[in-house]
């Protein structure tokens, strides 16, 4: 069925041009299945909602800085059978994000901590949450740079806005001033306001030795 010459510009004017992608297909379905006008309109609007949802998800994932291949589906649980798969499936529901709770992933290098951290963040993005993935060292360098040009507060906001912040590779090396203070301020500001996923090759009991000045 040929589209009306007026229909295309009207849909674009209403920012509904995505409907054009499935309009002809839906027209054929409507004729074959004898849909009512209301059913036909509902299918078109469902298509538009789905398209917009996928577009928004793609934007959230891009802004989060996540590797699209790091998902729970691509993680090799057989490689490290000590990982509690059921617990990760539960975390993938993202209830911890809704409750502003935190997740710590510890283990030796090469055990998949970063992969799992990104996978959980992707699941959160799929549920409508904003995420940001960044190595701890890179974050601290960025905050430190803000002390030189008086942009520290603005830079800190970058890490307070996301619903879930993934801090990768904490503990690779000791922290020197002002890094401990910056990290403390960040965690303190996010406490009960947003979630953190922290990956580390050191157990929490070892963390105090990373700080030159205990907090």
Question: Regions from the language model: what does each represent?
Answer:
Residues 17-68:
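Interdomain "pre-motor" coupling segment immediately N-terminal to P-loop NTPase/helicase cores
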Residues 83-161, 208-211:
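Conserved P-loop
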């Amino acid at each position: 069925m040929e589209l009306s010459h007026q229909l295309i510009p009207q849909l674009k004017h209403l920012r509904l041009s995505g409907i054009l992608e499935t309009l002809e297909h839906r027209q054929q379905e409507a004729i074959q299945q004898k849909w009512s006008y209301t059913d036909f309109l509902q299918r078109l609007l469902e298509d538009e909602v789905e398209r917009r949802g996928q577009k928004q998800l793609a934007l959230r994932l891009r802004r989060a800085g996540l590797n699209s291949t790091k998902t729970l589906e691509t993680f090799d649980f057989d490689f490290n059978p000590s990982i509690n798969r059921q617990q990760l499936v539960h975390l993938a529901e993202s209830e911890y994000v809704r409750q502003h709770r935190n997740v710590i992933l510890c283990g030796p290098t090469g055990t998949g901590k970063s992969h799992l951290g990104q996978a959980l963040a992707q699941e959160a993005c799929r549920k409508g949450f904003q995420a940001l993935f960044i190595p701890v060292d890179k974050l601290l360098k960025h905050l430190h740079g803000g002390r030189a040009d008086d942009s520290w507060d603005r830079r800190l906001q970058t890490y307070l806005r996301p619903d879930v912040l993934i801090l990768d590779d904490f503990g690779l090396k000791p922290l020197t001033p002002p890094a401990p203070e910056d990290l403390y301020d960040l965690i303190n500001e996010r406490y009960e306001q947003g979630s953190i996923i922290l990956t580390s090759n050191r157990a929490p009991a070892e963390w105090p030795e990373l700080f030159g000045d205990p907090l």
